[in-house]
Amino acid sequence: MAIVKCKPTSPGRRHVIKVVNKELYKGKPYSLLLSKKSKTGGRNNNGRITTRHIGGGHKRIYRIIDFKRNKDNITASIERFEYDPNRSSNIALILYKDGKRNYILAPKNLKVGDTVISGENVPIKIGNSLPIKNIPVGSFIHNVEMRPGKGGQIARSAGSYVQLVACDKEYATLRLRSGEMRKTESNCRATIGEVGNSEHMLKVLGKAGASRWIGIRPTVRGTAMNPVDHPHGGGEGRNFGKHPVTPWGLQTKGKKTRKNKRTEKFILRHRHK
């Protein structure tokens, strides 16, 4: 893994910082673990924009990732590491002893040829997946389930991890990188170690066109719009003089947006406190 700063041969190259990983496989992905992925442009089934600043970008093929890791007590070896355009982390192609292949999130410090295994009482080793109740307190884990058998949902992006703070027969307490403290069932599975490609956060696109390549459209300020488009729009010169709001007139700057009361009981400390 190397961080490369491009030479300023043009305005578009001047600020570019790349992350180069020579360990990544340069061929085509494993065809049996691919599926079609169509673009939405941020629109729903009615054609209305539900998520702004999305559209365009290079075509992508979805890699089917095994987030459940439920093929128990069968050793698998790391065949290769691959780039995945659908996520910030890299992925690893693993080959089980029975001949089946799967994609998993590539953990940090794992190498080609290393072995991983999942199960109830497997060794505490990077890349192994097991129930949280069997993991030592204080361990760093990733790909953590929120419900048993649903598949990992927490700590899946590049460089992310969760620390296991406490555990009893029913629930485990996790400390997320955001500062949030959360409970989850101790039967939920997690993978030992951190997610790899932690240098992803150091990458600088360097120009507007690079954002368009990955499907990100421009973010326009409300004050630069007309009154018909945004509550902040209009006025002679740079007038504002109001409380900041969203394009739909709802209060912003600190207003709580979380509405899922059903899972509120699992959050012991919010990330904003």
UniProtKB/Swiss-Prot annotation:
InterPro entries linked to this entry: NA-bd_OB-fold, Rib_uL2_dom2, Ribosomal_uL2, Ribosomal_uL2_bac/org-type, Ribosomal_uL2_C, Ribosomal_uL2_CS, Ribosomal_uL2_dom3, Ribosomal_uL2_RNA-bd_dom
Entries under SMART domains matching the protein: Ribosomal_L2 (SM01383), Ribosomal_L2_C (SM01382)
Function according to Swiss-Prot or TrEMBL: One of the primary rRNA binding proteins. Required for association of the 30S and 50S subunits to form the 70S ribosome, for tRNA binding and peptide bond formation. It has been suggested to have peptidyltransferase activity; this is somewhat controversial. Makes several contacts with the 16S rRNA in the 70S ribosome.
Pfam families tied to this protein: Ribosomal_L2, Ribosomal_L2_C
Entry-linked PANTHER family: LARGE RIBOSOMAL SUBUNIT PROTEIN UL2M, RIBOSOMAL PROTEIN L2
NCBIfam families associated with the record: rplB_bact
Keyword set, alphabetical order: Ribonucleoprotein, Ribosomal protein, RNA-binding, rRNA-binding
Family that this chain belongs to: Belongs to the universal ribosomal protein uL2 family.
GO CC terms: large ribosomal subunit
Assembly mode: Part of the 50S ribosomal subunit. Forms a bridge to the 30S subunit in the 70S ribosome.
Composition-biased stretches (Basic residues): 253-263
Location of region: Disordered: 224-263
Species of provenance: Buchnera aphidicola subsp. Schizaphis graminum (strain Sg)
Protein name: Large ribosomal subunit protein uL2
Record-linked SUPFAM superfamilies: Nucleic acid-binding proteins, Translation proteins SH3-like domain
GO MF entry, a single one: structural constituent of ribosome
Gene that this polypeptide is encoded by: rplB
Transmembrane segments: none
GO biological process: cytoplasmic translation
